[in-house]
Swiss-Prot record:
InterPro entries with a match to the protein in the record: Znf_TFIIS
Native source organism of the sequence: Invertebrate iridescent virus 3 (IIV-3)
GO molecular function: nucleic acid binding; zinc ion binding
Protein name: Putative transcription elongation factor S-II-like protein 055R
UniProt keyword annotations, A-Z: Metal-binding, Zinc, Zinc-finger
Zinc finger intervals, TFIIS-type: 85-136
Family, similarity comment: Belongs to the IIV-6 349L family.
SMART domains in the cross-refs: ZnF_C2C2
Pfam families tied to this protein: Zn_ribbon_TFIIS
GO terms for biological process, alphabetical: DNA-templated transcription
Signal peptide range: none
Amino acids binding Zn(2+): 89, 103, 128, 131
């Protein structure tokens, strides 16, 4: 869809040229059509009132919650962030810090992660490099 048709479509809901330009600026990029479709489907949602839908659509634009920024993708973004952190801070291999309970080896691959509340210590995930036994501490 070209810019003229896109503007015409947005003018149905956002009469002011300033608002249309703002939406086009906020959604600029390769997935612009997907983001505008998301705005329009939010406005046309039959399960809520038109005013509520319009308010939701405006909030999505203002808070950059279009596309991958939408809160529904938050768990997936968290997983990707953890994977990226793993790449920058990989496993540590240490001798003598931990000992395998199965084969008594001291070459252990381990990492720590905060799995409980902040006032609790981090959980250590360990794996023996000799017998591949895994455990947590």
């Amino acid at each position: 869809m070209d810019q003229t048709n896109l503007r015409r479509c947005l003018a149905t809901y956002f009469g002011d040229e300033k608002n249309i330009n703002h939406i086009l600026k906020k959604t600029a990029g390769p997935d612009q059509m997907v983001q505008i479709y998301q705005i329009l489907t939010t406005i046309e949602n039959p399960s809520h009132s038109e005013q509520d839908n319009f308010r939701r659509a405006v909030t999505m634009v203002k808070q950059n919650q279009l596309g991958w920024g939408h809160p529904i993708f938050q768990p997936e973004q968290q997983k990707i962030s953890e994977e990226n952190d793993f790449i920058t801070c990989p496993y540590e291999v240490s001798e003598g810090v931990l000992r395998c309970g199965k084969c008594d080896c001291t070459k252990i691959l381990w990492f720590s992660k905060q799995t409980r509340s902040m006032d609790e210590p981090t959980t250590i995930f360990a794996s023996c490099s000799n017998c591949k036994t895994r455990w947590t501490e």
